[in-house]
């Protein structure tokens, strides 16, 4: 029975000693040197909850992002309107004289003479076989019979005019050329009885047949050269030989 009280007293003594040692140690941390050792630190606890948001700070300066890579070139846009003409530039310096070919060289002269000789031969052949030449006129026929309007058109096509004798020599040349009665470039279509050439000029030479012009049938406004070389008025709608004159 005496053992139990003894143990109780022992435990109470140990608790009291431990408390006393703790207080003494805490006080010793304030007054004792650092060599006095206290109890070891405890284990870190769990993190606490997030605190409340603080007040909004001042606006910061604009930031600068990193410069990206250069992209590929874009498509060409539509062409713009033409700009205004610029002012004339300064006058250039005078150039060196050029070299002109010698137009009067012996070669050019010889070629020109050869061409003139050949043209003269051709005219002689044409005169001998197809036409007649008097002075600076060449009379030519194609041997076809047609109305006066068609004769005019034919001659104009070849840059000629309907044969119109201005004197006895030309009248005779046409007479010797034809084998049929031929139209001449003479009419009184504008004014009855007043015969003129196709340019409207009055005639200075005539060779009318006896009793002509008589305007038989009231529609004889054109003139024929007969086989005997005389003239006779006939209707322009009749068909006769075409003779043209070419200036040479």
From Swiss-Prot:
Residue ranges of coiled coil: 112-130
Compositionally biased residues, Pro residues: 75-87
Name of the protein in its database record: Mannose-binding protein C
Signal peptide interval: 1-20
Encoding gene (name): MBL2
Gene Ontology MF term list: D-mannose binding
Naturally occurring in which organism (per UniProt): Nomascus concolor (Black crested gibbon)
Composition bias, Basic and acidic residues: 49-61
SMART domains given in the database record: CLECT (SM00034)
Residue segments, region Disordered: 43-110
Known partners and oligomeric status: Oligomeric complex of 3 or more homotrimers. Interacts with MASP1 and MASP2. Interacts with MEP1A and MEP1B and may inhibit their catalytic activity.
Disulphide bond pairs: 155-244, 222-236
Residues recorded as bearing 4-hydroxyproline in the entry: 47, 73, 79, 82, 88
Domain spans labelled Collagen-like: 42-99
InterPro entries noted in UniProt: C-type_lectin-like, C-type_lectin-like/link_sf, C-type_lectin_CS, Ca-dependent_lectin, Collagen, Collectin_CTLD, CTDL_fold
Highest taxon listed in the record's lineage: Eukaryota
Role: Calcium-dependent lectin involved in innate immune defense. Binds mannose, fucose and N-acetylglucosamine on different microorganisms and activates the lectin complement pathway. Binds to late apoptotic cells, as well as to apoptotic blebs and to necrotic cells, but not to early apoptotic cells, facilitating their uptake by macrophages.
GO cellular component, one term: extracellular space
């Amino acid at each position: 029975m005496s053992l139990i009280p003894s143990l109780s007293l022992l435990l109470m003594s140990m608790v009291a000693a431990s408390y006393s040692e703790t207080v003494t140690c805490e006080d010793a941390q304030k007054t004792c040197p650092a060599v006095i050792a206290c109890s070891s630190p405890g284990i870190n606890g769990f993190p606490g909850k997030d605190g409340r948001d603080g007040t909004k700070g001042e606006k910061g300066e604009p930031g600068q992002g990193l410069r990206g890579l250069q992209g590929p070139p874009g498509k060409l846009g539509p062409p713009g309107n033409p700009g205004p003409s610029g002012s004339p530039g300064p006058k250039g310096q005078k150039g060196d004289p050029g070299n002109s070919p010698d137009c009067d060289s012996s070669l050019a002269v010889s070629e020109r003479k050869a061409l003139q000789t050949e043209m003269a031969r051709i005219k002689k052949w044409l005169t001998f076989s197809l036409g007649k030449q008097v002075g600076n006129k060449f009379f030519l026929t194609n041997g076809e019979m047609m109305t006066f309007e068609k004769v005019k058109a034919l001659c104009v096509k070849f840059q000629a005019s309907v044969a119109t004798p201005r004197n006895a020599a030309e009248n005779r040349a046409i007479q010797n050329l034809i084998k049929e009665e031929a139209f001449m470039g003479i009419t009184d279509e504008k004014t009855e009885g007043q015969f003129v050439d196709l340019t409207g000029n009055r005639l200075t030479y005539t060779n009318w047949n006896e009793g002509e012009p008589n305007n038989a049938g009231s529609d004889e406004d054109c003139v024929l050269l007969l086989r005997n070389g005389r003239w006779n008025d006939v209707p322009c709608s009749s068909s006769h030989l075409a003779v043209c004159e070419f200036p040479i």
